[in-house]
Design a protein with these regions (language model features):
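Alpha-helical interface subdomain recognition
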Residues: 1, 8, 23-28, 35, ...
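Internal helix-loop-helix
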Residues: 1-30, 34-40, 80-89, 100-101, ...
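A short, Trp-centered hydrophobic/proline-enriched beta-strand micro-motif
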Residues: 39-47
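Conserved hydrophobic/aromatic beta-strand scaffold that supports enzyme active sites
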Residues: 44, 60-62, 69, 89-93, ...
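Glycine-rich phosphate/pyrophosphate-binding beta-alpha loops
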Residues: 52, 77-84, 128, 165-169
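Short glycine/proline-enriched turns and hinge-like loops at secondary-structure junctions
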Residues: 55-57, 82-87, 101-104, 129-131, ...
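A short core secondary-structure module
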Residues: 73-118
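Flexible, small-/acidic-enriched active-site or ligand-binding loops
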Residues: 115-144
Length: 267
């Protein structure tokens, strides 16, 4: 089960579109959303760096205001959807300084093709090879000050909100992977015959399938409950993290058990 296509859609919807919908100005929404909701274009979310990711405050990419322009310098890595022919741009997390000299995360839109901005695909991945993953380089890249998303210095808040929704998307991917592996294993257990009967009639295989089904339903309930909290406007950050972790672990466990049921064919 390859999650490349799912990762492409998830990154665009939860990390590309959602911040613009939640925090963009009316002008920004009118400019970008019609194209980005058409199914013909993609948008990236530039957070991760060599020394920053989960520790977002370690961000080293900077933006300095120069009149009515931002001047951006730095490098981002492992950015999904940044180098495709469909990509229009990236929502970039950068460090800026306030009037007191304090550093804060700020969010800025940078369109593909902007001078000083280069996007390069990262090849040789072990997984998700069909999903675009890129390194972004900014060298004195200038964009209008109006490309600011929301308020200056509030990037950490916007980022965390986007990542909470992203965790639900990743959890859904894990659930789908687990469901697919279970269904394949169940079908194989019914059709593969050894010693005159299907292997699913052996208790050891039947017990494996029962455990897989139980874990699958628990993962589904965990994810759906968290989605219900989000849909009803309740806080869900803790539950989103739990759902992402749990469904990911269950996906690995069920996929591993499926390989065991397939035996040599699983390789």
């Amino acid at each position: 089960v390859d999650s490349s296509q799912a990762a492409t859609v998830v990154a665009h919807n939860s990390l590309g579109l959602t911040p613009i919908i939640n925090h963009g100005t009316t002008e920004q929404k009118e400019k970008y959303l019609p194209k980005l909701t058409s199914g013909k274009h993609l948008w990236a979310f530039g957070l991760t760096e060599e020394n920053a990711g989960s520790d977002a405050r370690g961000t080293e990419t900077t933006a300095v205001r120069d009149g009515d322009q931002w001047v951006i310098n730095g490098t981002k890595r492992y950015i999904t959807n940044a180098s495709t022919s469909l990509t229009l741009g990236v929502t970039l997390q950068v460090m800026t300084k306030d009037s007191n000299g304090r550093s804060n995360l700020t969010t800025i839109f940078v369109e593909n093709g902007t001078p000083g901005f280069e996007s390069k695909r990262m090849l040789g991945k072990m997984m998700w090879r069909a999903a675009d993953t890129s390194q972004l380089t900014f060298k004195d890249c200038q964009v209008p000050y109006s490309n600011l998303m929301g308020e200056e210095g509030q990037g950490i808040r916007y980022m965390l909100k986007a990542l909470d929704g992203g965790r639900l998307s990743i959890a859904a991917m894990g659930l789908g992977l687990a469901q697919g592996a279970f269904e394949m294993a169940l079908k194989h257990a019914k059709t593969r015959k050894q010693f005159g009967r299907s292997i699913g009639r052996n208790q050891v295989i039947g017990f494996k399938l029962a455990d897989m089904s139980m874990k699958l339903e628990l993962a589904r309930n965990t994810l759906y409950r968290t989605c219900m909290l989000k849909d009803n406007g309740h806080p869900y950050a803790r539950e989103a993290a739990m759902a992402k972790l749990y469904t990911s672990e269950i996906a690995r466990e069920i996929a591993d058990e499926a390989v065991q049921i397939f035996g040599g064919s699983g390789l």
